[in-house]
């Protein structure tokens, strides 16, 4: 078990704790590396996610080739629900839409984002993060010494200017918060707007 190359970090230990239950499945796919998004209470995400493991990839250890989303779905289906796959909403796994429509959906979404694929090739193209996620990450993970520069309105789209004004008006309080406190502060404000 590893995370970004480390086999002994606390995140690698977390992966081991979450994924050891899948070892029988792993044995069916020798020389393959399983990729998971793990959401754990001890490592809160920028936006709320369901706790647990989500199967997001499978890589051939010899060639580096990645399995298609279609193949990942087949593998997950063969595990009687043990491997959970990502979904868009209401259990719907894929959103088939145009790029221009996706840009509109992303503007309103309150989750991390989308993995975008080329349908004709079933091939991963890029990640599209939501502004909601990006602005939360931008401010919540900011060190106090970097906050002043981040409160420059030229660095964010104008729809986030009221948030900048709110943070500036409450800057002392905001600076005193830890990451989770900052996320709560931002979320509370964005829900009111």
Each model region followed by its residue ranges:
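Core nucleotide-handling region used for phosphoryl-transfer chemistry
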Residues: 1-193
């Amino acid at each position: 078990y590893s995370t970004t190359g480390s086999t002994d970090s606390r995140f690698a230990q977390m992966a081991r704790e979450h994924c050891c239950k899948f070892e029988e499945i792993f044995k069916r796919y020798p020389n393959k590396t399983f990729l998971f998004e793990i959401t754990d209470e001890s490592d809160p995400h920028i936006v709320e996610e369901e706790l647990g493991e989500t199967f997001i990839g499978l890589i051939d250890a010899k060639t580096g080739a990645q399995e298609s989303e279609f193949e990942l779905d087949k593998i997950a289906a063969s595990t009687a629900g043990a491997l959970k796959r990502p979904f868009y909403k209401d259990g719907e796994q894929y959103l088939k839409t145009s790029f221009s429509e996706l840009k509109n959906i992303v503007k309103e979404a309150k989750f991390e984002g989308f993995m975008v694929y080329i349908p004709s090739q079933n091939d991963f193209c890029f990640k599209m993060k939501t502004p909601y996620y990006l602005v939360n990450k931008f401010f919540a993970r900011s060190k106090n010494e970097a906050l002043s520069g981040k409160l420059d309105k030229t660095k964010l789209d104008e729809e986030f200017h009221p948030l900048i004004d709110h943070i500036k008006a409450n800057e002392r309080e905001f600076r005193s918060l830890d990451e989770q406190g900052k996320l709560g502060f931002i979320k509370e404000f964005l829900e009111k707007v």
